[in-house]
């Protein structure tokens, strides 16, 4: 029988499922099975949970893993990297609901700092960030870690257009340049922030030009260590592909190998889909999970004989399943 647009062998079906799995791994490249709470205070990717804020009345942020494993169906704001922060999942700041990964409720991080970013608002304009409608580039201040619109930076820069993004590596916002002027002394002991309030646009090697005297180094180490050395950023380990079975390329091999791949691939795909962040179709995923066993049993004979699966075969499978379901009511 010649294959049509509606026909495929089980092996081809499995290959299609494996491709979907690879695409899912590209969306979620990191493992999300470990909460960072026990690691203490880190510079790490964070997500503010607005849903838990409404319930607890407290600002919060959760780590990458918890944003997926514990807060996937909540209203989250991507805060990107924030320094010296301990995950708030499973604390009073997230309504004292146990973390799904730690299975516990613990004390919230007393050293965590919060600003208007944790409410979903950014920049001196205090605008709610919407990634779907946001236009233009935003830049993060190396000191306060707030994000600023290019047009707003220009306003604080006496109306002068900011330098091309390719010409600087770091931003110090106008408020921080004024607040931390004494931390930004050059080798002549003059503040690189100048005397007027304005943003600073620093090169990658700006630290080499800061004052090296013992007093200045001590001050920076004590209050602004990010001016001394670039901070390490925690990243979750990459999700391994151990769960992806190797396809048997030899069609003459026993169909049992393909049958095993079907089962393995279905489990892998379901596992990834079930854990995708903020997926709105969870009910469909769970329904598909219940179908796995029946569908595997149905496809096994096709796999063993390397037969094509037609659209009619699949339709008959679901019609029969529907008939049985009605008889059981």
UniProtKB/Swiss-Prot annotation:
InterPro entries from the UniProt entry: UBR7, UBR7-like_UBR-box, Zinc_finger_PHD-type_CS, Znf_FYVE_PHD, Znf_PHD, Znf_PHD-finger, Znf_RING/FYVE/PHD, Znf_UBR
Protein name: Protein mlo2
PANTHER family found in the cross-reference section: E3 UBIQUITIN-PROTEIN LIGASE UBR7 (PTHR13513), E3 UBIQUITIN-PROTEIN LIGASE UBR7-RELATED (PTHR13513:SF9)
Keyword Phosphoprotein assigned: no
Keyword Electron transport set for record: no
Zn finger intervals (PHD-type): 120-179
GO process annotations (BP): chromatin remodeling
Similarity annotation: Belongs to the UBR7 family.
Domain of life, per lineage: Eukaryota
Gene Ontology molecular function terms on file: ubiquitin protein ligase activity; zinc ion binding
Keywords: Metal-binding, Zinc, Zinc-finger
Short name of one Pfam family: PHD
Any one GO CC term of the record: chromatin
Renumbered zinc finger spans (UBR-type): 33-104
SUPFAM superfamilies with a match to the protein in the record: FYVE/PHD zinc finger
The gene coding this protein: mlo2
Cystine connections: none
